Amino acid sequence: MKKIVISSLCLLSATMVFAENMKEASIVNANDTSRVIDLDEVVVVAQPKEGVRLRQQPMSSSAFGMQDMQTLQVKSLGQLADYVPSFVMPQYGSRLTSSMYIRGIGSRLNNSSVGLYYDHIPLMSKSAFNTHFYQLDRVDVLRGPQGTLYGGNSEGGIVRIYSKNPMNYQGTDVSLGLGMGLGYGRKAEVAHYHRPSDKLAFMVAGFYNSEDGFFNNTNLNEKNDKIDEAGAKVRLMWKPTAKLTFDLTSDYQYTIQNGFPYGAYDADKDETADPSTTFMNTYRRQMVNTGLTVSYDLNSYLLTSTTSHQYLWDRMKMDQDYVPTDYLSLQQTQKMNAVTEEIVFRSKNASRWQHATGIFGSYQWLHIDAPVGFGQGMTDMLDAMMQRVLPATHQMTFANFRVPGDFRTPQMNAAVFHESNLHLSDRLMATLGLRFEHHQIKNDYLTTALADITMTMTIPGRPAPTVMNIPYESKFESSVKKTSNQLLPKFGLTYRLCEDGSNIYAVVSKGYLAGGYNFQGFSDIFQMEMRSLGANFPRDGKVQHTADDQAQKDQQISYDAETTWNYEAGTHLNLFDHKVKADVAFFYTQIRNQQISRMSADYGFGRVIDNAGKSYSCGVEAALRGQAFDNHLMWGATYSFTHAKFKEYDDYDNARNLISYKDNYVPFIPQHQFSVNGDYRFDVEDDILSSITLGFNVKGQGKTYWEANNDMYQKFYATLGAHMMFKLNKVEVDFWGRNLTNTNYHTFLVNSQMTNQSFAHQGNPLHAGVDLRMHF
C-alpha cells in the first residue's frame, strides 16, 4: 500500500511538472465553468421500463459512458466492478466463472443473484455473463433488489449494458491492442455503422482476442491461463414510421482457453505456487444471443416488446484435485437454449403519475453431461478404505472407477408487474411497485457409479486364492420438480432538496433467488455409500436402492429459494454548480435461506449449494465524480463498507460433528472497497497532435474470507494503474499499465479435503500494453 501511495504522488507530481512546462497547454480559466452532466442527459438509450432518470429514482446506481470506460482502461465487466461501490466480480478460473456480488449478496453456482441485460435482452445463463462486451455506449449498475421491474435473480442488483445505436452513430471504428511482457496479448476489433436512410441503419462488428497467459503449469510446461476468442455482431434498426421501431441484434462468440490456474497455497508463508496438474484444465464455449425489440410510440405512452433466443454450448475439463497425482477429474458439457418475451406499457409524458406495467415469460432448456473420473490416487485410497473394513483374508481393488451423470433441468418463469412514480408535490415523489412471479424448475437425472472390482479371497486349506471380478454398479434415477410463487413489492420516497436536482430518498424492497438442484455432489454421495456398505458389499456388485433411498437423495441435492428484504436511505447531490456529483447510500439487508457454495462435505468432490438459515448485510456506499479546469481534469472516487454475517447457519465437519457458523462472515464478500482515478488533458496547438492525456487509478479491496469457517482470507490490498494517451487527428494511441506495484493477491481460494491442501488463483502481476483506436 505504501508503494502505491508513493507511486501515485510521483505520478501526480510528474503531471504537474509536465503541465508547467507545456507552453502550448491551455491556460486555466479562473472562471472555470466545468459541469458534470448526468449520463442520462448525454448518452440517451431506450428505456422500456423507466421514465425517470437514474439519479432521480430512490436507488443507488452507477452509470458509465464509452469515454468513462476508455479513461478507466476497462476491458471487461470484472474490471468495471472495481469502480462501483459494493460490487465485485472476481476474475478467476475461466470464462465459465462469472460470479457477481453486490452488497454481500451473490451466488457462485447455478443461478445468479445479479441480473445482466445486454441491449434489453435478459441473459438467462450465468455461464454467458463473463464474455467480451464491445462497441458499448453505456453501462448501468443498479444496486439493491430490482425485483419489481426485473424479477427473480436480481436481488443483489442489475447490470444493464447498451451498445452503440447505429441510428445515432455512424462511421468505422478500428481498435488494435498489444500487451507487452508477462501475459503477452493481442486484440483486434472492427465495427462499421451505416445509416443509408432516415428509416434504416445497421452495424456489423467483429473481434479477436488472444493472451499468452501469466501462470505456467510446472507439471505440463504450458501456460495455464492462455485464451483465444473471437466473435461477430450485427445490429439492424428499422423505422418504417415515425412511431414504430424494430431493433434486431445478434451476437456470436467463441472461446477456447486454458483455465483454472490454481496453485498450492502455503498459509504459513503466505506464498502460492504455480499450478501443477495431471492434465491441462480447459474450457470451450460457443454462444449466440439474438434479440428483437419492437417499440410503438403512442404519443403519451410507449409500448415495447422484447423477444430473445439464447444458445450456449460449453465444455469444461478440470483436474479437480489440482495436483500432479491423478485423483479426480470432471468433464462437464452443457447445452442451453432459452427463449424470453417481455411486453411493457409505460407512460412517457411529464405528468404527476408515471407508470409502467408489463408481463414477462421465459423458458430454458438445459442439458448437463458431467462424468466424473477417479484416477489411480483415488482408487488407492478406496482400496485402503475397503481393506480397513474387510477381513484379513479378503482383498478388494478398484479399477476404471467413474461416475457418469446426465442432468436435464428445464426452467420456466412467468411474471406480471407494475411500478408507479407519483409526484405528491413539486418536491416529493412516491415509488410503488409490485411483481408476481412464478418459477418452476425440473430435474430429470440419471447418475451411476461404475467400477471394475477385483476381490481376492485367501481361504485356509486351499492351494490358491479365489479371485472374483465384480462389475460394481450403483444407480440413482429420478424426476423431481420445484415450484415457487413470489410477491416482490417496492416502496420508495424521493424528496428533491433544491432546483439543481439534489435529493434524498428512502426505499424498502424485496428480492429473491430461485431454488434448484445440485449435480456435483453425487460423487461424494457414492463414496459415502461405499464406505457405509463395507463388508456388506453385494456379491454381484449391484447396489439396490429403495424408494426411501431415492427420496433421501432427491432431498439431499435440493436447495431452497433465497429471499431478501432491503432497507435503504441515501442522497444524490449536485455540488458546486454541478461541478461535483456525490452519491451516498446506507443499507441493511435481511437474508433468509442464503444460498452458500461450499465443497462437498466428506471428500470435497465438487461444489454444492447449501442454504444458511439467516444472515444479514449492512453497509455504506459513496461515490464522487467531478470535472475541473474547463473540463481538462476528470476525476472520481468510490468507497464502500459491507458487513455481511451469518445469524443462523449450522453444518457438519468430516467427523459428522455439528458446527455453528453464527456470527461468521459470509465468504467471498470484501469488507472494504475503494477506487480513486484522475485524468488530465493537455491541449496542444499542433497540426497532427491535438492533446495528451495523463491518467492514473488506484483500486483496492479486502478483507475477504474464502470459507464459512473464516479460517482463510485475503487481506486488504490495492493496485496502481496508469495510462498516457496521445490524440491525433482521427487516431488515439494509449499506453497503459496495470498493477504497476506488482501487488501479490488472490482472486479465489479453495480448500481441498481430498488432499488437505488449499489452492488459490493469483491476481495478474504487473503488465502493460498499448491500444490504438481509429474512427473514420
Where are these regions (language model features)?
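Periplasmic N-terminal gating module of Gram-negative TonB-dependent outer-membrane receptors
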Residues: 32-43, 52-98, 105-119, 129-143, ...
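Periplasmic-side early beta-strands and strand-to-turn transitions of outer-membrane beta-barrels
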Residues: 168-170, 177, 191-279, 312-325, ...
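Outer-membrane beta-barrel translocator/receptor signature
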Residues: 112, 125, 134-137, 143, ...
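C-terminal beta-signal and adjacent terminal beta-strands/loops
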Residues: 512, 699-707, 725-776
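Gram-negative outer-membrane beta-barrel transporters
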Residues: 356, 426-430, 579-591, 608-707, ...
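Membrane-embedded beta-barrel scaffold of Gram-negative outer-membrane proteins
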Residues: 293-318, 503-507, 520, 526-610, ...
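Solvent-exposed loop segments that connect transmembrane elements
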Residues: 216-222, 260-276, 321-328, 371-404, ...
